[in-house]
Amino acid sequence: KNLIFLGSSCIYPRISRMPIKEKYLLTGELEKTNEPYAIAKIAGIKMCESYNFQYKTNFKCLMPCNIYGPNDNYDLETSHFFPALIKKIHNAKKKKKKFIEIWGNGKAKRELTYVDDLADACEFFLSKKTKEVLINIGSGYELKIIDYCKFIMKKMKCSLAIKKNSKMPNGTPRKLLDCKIAKSYGWRHRYTLEKGFNFTYRDFLRRNIK
């Protein structure tokens, strides 16, 4: 039996050596802001490991970094940072505002992977026999939150001041994944940040997100 369970880069220890290897799971304290989510995901991973041991199944746990792309969630109360930035900057430009606000100091670094790359990884590894249960899936490319702001502004052809809300958390400082295991089986990501953003923003405009 084959199964893909999706973990996440945010269930690794809050402070970890970079890039993050699969073996670092459960070697340090979790990020408090998403601890319940992390515990639930880790429980699923342990179930997969136990099934493989007891029933000789072929269950794998892919560990993606931040995923973005068409049909993303742009609700500012519940969305991840990248779609939130897209919406904030788009709306600020449209309403001729002079600034946007971000959480924390903007120095936390994040790695992004386009949604089609994750879908490709799921299909690639579903029936493939691997000795590893955990397999990181990422692009190998990270930027500071504040630099993602500048990238989006450049793509939208606008310039806005960035107001940092120090009352809000920064989150985990870095979450860059080591994807050597995935690459050893022949998987590679295909979408650059620029290409992925173009598809994502086109979808955002098509859906007329308010």
Where are the predicted features?
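Conserved active-site helix of classical SDR/Rossmann-fold NAD(P)-dependent CH-OH oxidoreductases
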Residues: 42-49, 82-87, 119-120, 146
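Short aromatic-enriched loop/helix-cap "lid" or pocket-rim segments at secondary-structure transitions
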Residues: 15-18, 72-77, 148-149, 174-175
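Glycine-rich "substrate-gating" loop/helix at the edge of Rossmann-like oxidoreductase active sites
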Residues: 34-37, 65-80, 104-116, 139-141
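N-terminal Rossmann-like NAD(P)+-binding domain of SDR-like oxidoreductases, especially those catalyzing
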Residues: 1-73, 199-202, 210
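Glycine-rich, phosphate-binding/catalytic loops in enzymes
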Residues: 19-23, 78-80, 119, 153
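C-terminal substrate-binding subdomain of Rossmann-fold SDR/epimerase-dehydratase oxidoreductases
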Residues: 91-210
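Alpha-helical segments that scaffold the active site and NAD(P)H-binding pocket
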Residues: 49-54, 86-90, 127
